[in-house]
């Protein structure tokens, strides 16, 4: 991947890159890495295996939430249709009816229907009561039987025009009950009338049949003295309570999903950070140079946070949106399929709006992080370089640089935000337009009797839920590209092959050999470098000896000692410690033998005591004090009020350079290793402290091997062997006197630093 660091333009004026050029460059990189980013995101999913149970629970809760969400419009529909329009009476099956009414209804029933009614009703005096244990299927059959019969009874009632016309047609006296006349007719004649009614009912909307039956039942209840208003209120209240219960379940499910999603995403972030940390800790110097420190920090914090946030949202939105959308479509088809074309129009318009906005805004959106990185880079350079900027009076120039980076980011942010501000108003316009269109079409359906008002209201709510599911997925599609980039950057670290690895069959040094170092014809070249930094270096140091390395800047001194702790592997030859090739030992066993003091003293946040104990936490307070005394650190430690418990800030910024070096030396001494390595670790000390330290150190380390890299000859005059490096080659090896006699390079260094009296 072309890392974001690489896309950030250089800060010099000659290499300033315009936003337009940066947009094109990032687009090409984005297209090239989009597939790899998706693959990286999928690879990171393996970290979710630990949370498989939680994920199953999340999916179950989302189904529960969606079920309740999709049930609410249905309850709203029932409150309007049944509770308000039908006075709380759900169908044409009366709970109770008079014997006379049943006899009238049975006129229009066949023998099977009469039998089914008699089986499911019990006569009590002059009324019939519905049994409590009837099945849903039986109730549906009874509803169908009663609906037709009730329509016929209403149609041929004494007050109806149709009933009076039939009486006149049959030549019966005026005032004769039409139903009494029908009861006296032959069964064949009644069945003929019923056949004609069935033909008409086929073309009649179901809602009209239902309304007729419900009206009949309501009239019957009133005749029996039942309070229909109480039935209506009870139905509305019970439906309202069920809706409140559904809303409570939705709330609890949503809270649970959010909580569990945050937990799963948090565990994912924790595991990713741990994996990155363990991977980075296994890096050799070669891998450290591949990734900058700032980049590794960003990858283990911001990038992990980006993936973590998207994963939490993915559980709540990406999984929920399809469940809600598909469920909404099923509910719509069950409600009324004649208006589904409206949903097709709405979804089409939404997709067009999203496509246009993404085409316009996405190229700018994808470079936002790059522009932020560029602003951070400029800010960091300015803040760290303030003394130099002031010294050269370049404040105005740096202000212009910062202003340009800031303006580029601001313009791009404004452009993206302006584009995105159009999304919600357009979506609201589409949603409101869909609502108007549904109401318009639904009004015609209600007028024609093919649909009820409650169904229209439910259809609107289902349509909004389907549209919202598309909006949720759209919102995620904005965040996913950034998460993919973050996942790819994390994956780059995790899949990096570590060049320095322990041998599968490690060799352990003999206890009889300690503190021995041997370079056997060692040559070394940095990865991807054409020339050797070190060539054919050979020497041997035994226990108790002091080996010094000196040479001009860039001669390979630090590189040479970095081969001992195996920060790099040699290109040719071998480095042996205690008679074993360092490549055959485990890194831990090798480094446990070493006490390393780097060129730049590194301290950790904590106290002076914790820093000295860093290599060997179990040492006593007396050993801590002894290490500080040898390192000449007690001079400033004793002046502090808290002495060894004095705080040390991150990086040791609250101590001077010389104090930092002395504490670093004390840390190595406290470890009591077999081999001490000092990489120009006395450079920040004055001559007096340097002399006292070398004297104390020589006494303390007499049983250990000491390797010293130095710039000052005065530091290494007493060394048992001095190795002189010149452009990666050994120009000489021996004591100070031997080198003064036969090594020209050493002589030049000595004459440049020492007076004639000191040389004599």
State where each predicted segment sits.
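Extended hydrophobic secondary-structure segments
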Residues: 257, 282, 289-318, 340, ...
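Generic alpha-helical transmembrane segments of integral inner-membrane proteins
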Residues: 56-67, 244, 248-252, 256, ...
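Short intracellular "coupling" helices and adjacent cytoplasmic loop segments at the cytosolic face
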Residues: 24, 84-91, 98-105, 110, ...
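Membrane-integrated ABC transporters
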Residues: 1-72, 76-243, 249, 253, ...
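An intracellular "coupling" helix at the cytosolic face of ABC transporter transmembrane type-1 domains
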Residues: 175, 186, 193, 285-286, ...
